[in-house]
């Protein structure tokens, strides 16, 4: 459907779709039977293993786009569309540093995330550090109890970093923090790495909303874009709202087609242009090794049970 959007500008796109069937043998056969040097751009495969297999078999002159997954490969023909974790970390930290409202800062982490906790502590030296409980056997329980944080928070604004990849710990901490919120104590929960632990079925949306959960994200929410033409067409065709993956596919493909048409994929000016679509924004920067990476992201906030873009 991104190609349909592009065609309204009077520009034809010759599109070929190849189904790897998530099978290495099928992928190998496709690579053997097709001349991919005839294409301006190759988007995918979607999974990291399949993508890595393809990139090792494709000539360097073919630009290959990693749409949904990250790859550790550093080939100069790869266009990395997923922002790196360190960029998301820096964006969240920068947002907090620019905040002019005074707040006490706290860092809560499990032992597996001590390194990032210490990193945040170096940036905010006055922040108070807390770690999950270690049992008598020396095992991290990835839990804390109410008494561990009792009398910790001050009247006014309290900003709490939660650094973990454990869903149970997120559930545990968000519940405890929520119990401290009252008319005089405000608690804002944030993280520098919103992973799947923050999205599990055990996570209370009410708690996260009540804590005004802030986080960095590669995409924004569709909730305010239901009147978008693409969303309407997709809903009409498939009788459902598009998933974040379908929207990313649309945004990413449309952006690359426009950049390809303008010659930006072969231009040093590529890093000067930021574009934004339904849920995604793109600003590619060529690093010291000549590799293109997307350096655009969002800051989102959970408020009144809705996701709001704040930066």
Model-flagged regions — what are they?
Residues 1-15:
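Signal peptide-proximal N-terminal region
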Residues 11-72:
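Beta-alpha junction/loop-to-helix N-cap segments that form part of ligand/metal-binding clefts
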Residues 12-31, 127-154:
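A short, well-structured beta->alpha microelement
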Residues 35-47, 65-67, 104-110, 154-173, ...:
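Periplasmic-binding protein-like
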Residues 63-67, 72-90:
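Extracellular glycoside hydrolase catalytic/binding regions
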Residues 84-135:
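An alpha-beta-alpha
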Residues 173-248:
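Extracellular/periplasmic periplasmic-binding protein-like sensory domains
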Residues 239-243, 257-307:
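Segments of small-molecule ligand-sensing domains
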């Amino acid at each position: 459907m991104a190609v349909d959007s592009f065609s309204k500008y009077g520009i034809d796109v010759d599109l070929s779709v190849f189904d790897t069937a998530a099978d290495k043998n099928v992928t190998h056969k496709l690579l053997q039977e097709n001349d991919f040097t005839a294409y301006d751009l190759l988007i995918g495969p979607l999974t990291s293993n399949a993508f890595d297999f393809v990139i090792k078999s494709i000539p360097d002159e073919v630009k290959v786009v990693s749409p949904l997954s990250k790859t550790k490969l550093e080939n100069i023909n790869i266009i990395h569309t997923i922002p790196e974790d360190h960029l998301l970390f820096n964006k969240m930290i920068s947002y907090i540093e620019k905040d002019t409202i005074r707040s006490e800062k706290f860092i809560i982490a499990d032992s597996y995330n001590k390194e990032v906790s210490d990193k945040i502590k170096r940036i905010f030296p006055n922040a108070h550090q807390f770690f999950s409980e270690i049992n008598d056997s020396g095992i991290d329980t990835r839990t804390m109890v109410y008494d561990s944080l009792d009398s910790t928070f001050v009247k006014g604004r309290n900003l709490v970093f939660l650094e973990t990849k454990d869903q149970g710990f997120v559930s545990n901490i968000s519940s405890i923090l929520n119990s401290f919120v009252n008319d005089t104590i405000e608690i804002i929960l944030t993280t520098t790495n919103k992973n799947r632990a923050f999205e599990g079925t055990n996570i209370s949306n009410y708690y996260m909303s009540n804590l005004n959960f802030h986080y960095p994200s590669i995409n924004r929410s569709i909730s305010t874009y239901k009147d978008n033409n693409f969303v309407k067409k997709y809903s009409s065709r498939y009788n459902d709202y598009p998933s974040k993956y379908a929207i990313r596919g649309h945004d990413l493909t449309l952006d690359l087609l426009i950049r390809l048409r303008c010659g930006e994929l072969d231009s040093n000016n590529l890093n000067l242009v930021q574009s934004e679509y339904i849920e995604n924004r793109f600003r590619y920067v060529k690093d010291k090794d000549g590799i293109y990476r997307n350096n655009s992201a969002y800051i989102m906030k959970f408020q009144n049970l809705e996701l709001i873009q704040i930066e």
